[in-house]
Amino acid sequence: MAIVVVGGHSRNIGKTSVVAGLIGRLPQFHWTAFKITQYGHGFCTANGEPCDCQTDDHTLAVSEERSRTSGTDTARFLAAGAARSIWVRTRVGMLAEAMPRIRKELGLAENAIIESNSILQFLKPDLYLTVLDAGTADFKDSARLFLDRADAVLVRAAENGLVPRWDRVSLKLIEGKPRFVIASPDYMTDEVAGFVEQHIARHCSLAK
């Protein structure tokens, strides 16, 4: 099997659309899709809503999406054609607790695509794509930590010639890496899908 990870430096920059786009354009891989969400204090991992609970049973939740029309990101993955879609929620810094369940689900998958940066602490994917948007100043620590591990960079099309202004981020880490421009609404191109398809095919041939 192949594992593809899609990450990025902030929220709302197209990561979920990239995952859904790859699922839709490469249906032959029968993807199991994972959405990994880490919440800070004051949010419940059971449903992602604000809460005051601090009990141990609210530090981790894993659920499989059953509906294609619920409006969630995991529903988008199913609607795009994923064989299965799984939502993992943990408290910030506690993803390790979810790894036994994640590895179990990976063992059942034909191929997997995971929306996350932090998962790279615990596994080495066959392909890691990072999404960058020069118009968004926020830069997650997890994205900064793993920027040099990206196999390709998906650059969100900038308006008005925006120049990145990210603190403590060295773009030298991605010099020489393949770059693809993506844009709304689907944040996917034939070139990106082809790159992923070729990479997986190469992985599968080496694994034989």
Question: What is the meaning of each model-derived region?
Answer:
Residues M1:
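Phosphate-binding P-loop
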Residues V5, H30-F34, T130:
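Conserved beta-strand elements of the Class I
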Residues V5-L22:
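Glycine-rich phosphate-binding P-loop
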Residues G21-T90:
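N-terminal phosphate/diphosphate-binding loop that engages ATP/GTP or pyrophosphate donors
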Residues L60, A83-L108:
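Active-site rim loops that border cofactor/substrate pockets in soluble metabolic enzymes
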Residues K104-N111, S116-Q198:
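Conserved catalytic-core segment of NTP-binding enzymes
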Residues V196-K208:
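Short, hydrophobic alpha-helical segments
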